[in-house]
Amino acid sequence: MDAASETMHDLGYEQLTTAMVADRAGASIGTVYRYFPDRIAVLQSVASRNLDRALNVLKASLRDGGSSTLEGSLDVAVDALVEVFRTEKGFRSLRVGDVLDIRPVASARGGNAEIARVIREDLEQRQGLLLDSNARLAVETAIDVADALLGRAFLHSDRGETSLIAEAKRVSMLAVSGVTH
């Protein structure tokens, strides 16, 4: 999966082939097919790993610098995602897999929804702050918008375009403004 992530970092996930993964890994194509039946399986596996890593960074960030407010938790979440964009090869291309349009959809919940769930659970467990259905939708919307803007911010730069990172924070805050919790 490291070879796939590195290749995606350079070329994007659309151009990724199993042959490229094998070449980058210094392995035969048969070795790749032993673990992954096709290119889609490679993409799904990398997306799953990306989600696991993003959730780990997010949970640690919320634990270490979490906030007692929804807005503060979103700020921490965007910073955590920026860290993952900067440190995980290929993350800027595939992110947590929500960009993949593979039918039928394997799960009703996407990666961004899982990120929103972690934020909600942190607020509920650590702060006793219960979010109603409107607030939960607002958090998911904030994460979807932040993901889209961060994807643009890191499209051409490993460090990210600071104006788009700031915009991701600003717009995610707008998504939850006025939400009662």
Where are these regions (language model features)?
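Helix-turn-helix
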Residues: 7-41
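Short linear capping/connector segments at secondary-structure termini
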Residues: 59-64, 94-103
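Short, structured helix-loop boundary elements
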Residues: 18, 40, 67, 71, ...
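Hydrophobic/aromatic-rich alpha-helical bundle segments in the mid-to-C-terminal region
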Residues: 93, 97, 105, 125-172
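Alpha-helical structural segments
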Residues: 2-6, 10, 24, 41-61, ...
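Charged/polar positions within long, soluble alpha-helices
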Residues: 9, 86-90, 120, 124, ...
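Amphipathic alpha-helical packing segments from all-alpha helical-bundle domains
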Residues: 56, 72-87, 102-128, 136-140, ...
